[in-house]
Amino acid sequence: QPDLMVYHDAIHDYSTNEPTMDGTACLTYYLSAMQKEGMKQAGASADKNVYVNGGIVRTDPSKKQISLVFTAADKADGADAIISTLKRHGIKGSFFFTGEFYELYPEIVKRLLNEGHLVGSHSYGHLLYMPWENRDSLLVTREEFEKDMLKSYEAMRKAGIEYKDAPIYIPPYEYYNKEIAAWAKNMGIQVVNYTPGTMSNADYTTPDMGQKYRSSKFIYNKIMEVEKKEGLNGHLMLIHFGTDNRRTDKFYNSYLDKLIKTLKRKGYTFTPILEAIGIKTNSAL
């Protein structure tokens, strides 16, 4: 996230000269066809997920399960550390990337897929949907939103990821409102977001942000504090896949491993997000 932004812990125009029925148009048709199936799968059993503004921010609170989710716009410095840590612990994570990321790091995407992780959308152009000071207004039209999402899924398709493998997405900046969630759902895509409270999403902050900066130790201790007070059942815990070079204290380098070990000792299981949400897929992922 850019420097001017404050992490939130509460709850491009696209044109083509190709023929009308291009890959994007085909994808529009495909997403529409898949929408009913995806929603049917999600509603197959009683929905115990927790929603905020139409997005899932927590899975079944009665289950001692945590889902690790990672987002990235254009940075991938955590790739080796994160992939190796998850592999060591036998955990399948969920990774949400922008279109730029898919274009910059195809080999990393391939690695993640080969390891059996879910790889999905973080939008194509990393658009800011609403002003930070007014969540109820919009900076994008529905048409702009849909074109951006279709372009995102086209980039995913080129990487070998079908819609059925990733019918969920984390919005850019982890920031959305009810209207965005409704537009996404109309396309057959469910918004998901991190569970607020632990401040794990503040792992991108840099020392020059002053009082807004959160060290890895602070974040780890905050997670443990929340666990002790109310538990982490059903939490979607977000960690950034890469952060600014000005942040040398990378959470994924040492604290991710420590966090997993500690929470496992406390009896938590790390559950793939689609399984935790209750969406079944025929994918090998």
Can you say where each PLM-predicted feature lies in the sequence?
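Aromatic (Trp/Tyr) and acidic
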Residues: 1-41
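Pocket-edge structural micro-motifs
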Residues: 9, 31, 70, 121, ...
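Short, surface-exposed alpha-helical recognition segments that flank or form part
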Residues: 15-18, 22, 70, 140-144, ...
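A structural signal for well-ordered alpha-helical segments within the folded catalytic domains
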Residues: 18-32, 80, 150, 178, ...
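Feature targets compositionally biased, intrinsically disordered low-complexity regions
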Residues: 42, 53-54, 230-233
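Active-site beta->alpha N-cap acidic-glycine motif
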Residues: 45-137, 151-167, 259-262, 278
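Catalytic domains of cell-wall/extracellular-matrix polysaccharide-remodeling enzymes
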Residues: 103-104, 128-238, 242-269, 273-285
